[in-house]
């Protein structure tokens, strides 16, 4: 398997409930290396740009409002088959459908406030990483 990078967000609801450490522990126990991380309070423009592919969909405005409601943690994870493994650890988008022990089953509050975001493909991971991080902010180890 190839070593990949994926992009991850711990969303405002999980940050507000002090779940950052618990989520990071899950990443590391799953074998991921956290090679970049920072806390941000997204602006409306940042959130709209990041989620631009969803513009015009019924949930877009609520998603932008939620993602700008408080600080988020953004990180780059590195590991074997990182994109798919991160998605598996996150669980289903709808926490009602997420398997027990996944991040969304354990930390989500609702479909929108579902605790975490993760890239859905290697190509989107590259785009999402570049949206928030410069090369000198990424520290392979």
UniProtKB/Swiss-Prot annotation:
GO cellular component: cytoplasm
Localization annotation: Cytoplasm
Name listed for the protein in its UniProt record: Nucleoside diphosphate kinase
Chief place where the protein resides: cytoplasm
Binding positions for ATP per the UniProt entry: 11, 59, 87, 93, 104, 114
E.C. code: 2.7.4.6
Main EC class the enzyme belongs to: transferase
Organism lineage string: Bacteria, Pseudomonadati, Pseudomonadota, Gammaproteobacteria, Enterobacterales
Gene symbol of the encoding locus: ndk
UniProt source species: Yersinia enterocolitica serotype O:8 / biotype 1B (strain NCTC 13174 / 8081)
Alphabetical list of HAMAP family matching this protein: NDP_kinase
Function: Major role in the synthesis of nucleoside triphosphates other than ATP. The ATP gamma phosphate is transferred to the NDP beta phosphate via a ping-pong mechanism, using a phosphorylated active-site intermediate.
């Amino acid at each position: 398997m190839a070593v990949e990078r994926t992009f991850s967000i711990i969303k405002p609801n999980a940050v507000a409930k002090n779940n950052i450490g618990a989520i990071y522990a899950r990443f590391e126990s799953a074998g991921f290396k956290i090679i970049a991380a920072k806390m941000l309070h997204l602006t409306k423009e940042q959130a709209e740009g990041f989620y631009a592919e969803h513009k015009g969909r019924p949930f877009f405005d609520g998603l932008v409002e939620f993602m700008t409601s408080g600080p988020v943690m953004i990180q780059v994870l590195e590991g074997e088959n990182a994109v798919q493994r991160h998605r598996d650890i996150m669980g289903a988008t709808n926490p009602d459908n997420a398997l027990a022990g996944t991040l969304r089953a354990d930390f989500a509050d609702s479909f929108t406030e579902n605790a975490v975001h993760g890239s859905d493909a290697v190509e989107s991971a590259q785009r999402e990483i570049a949206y928030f991080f410069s090369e000198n902010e990424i520290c392979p180890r």
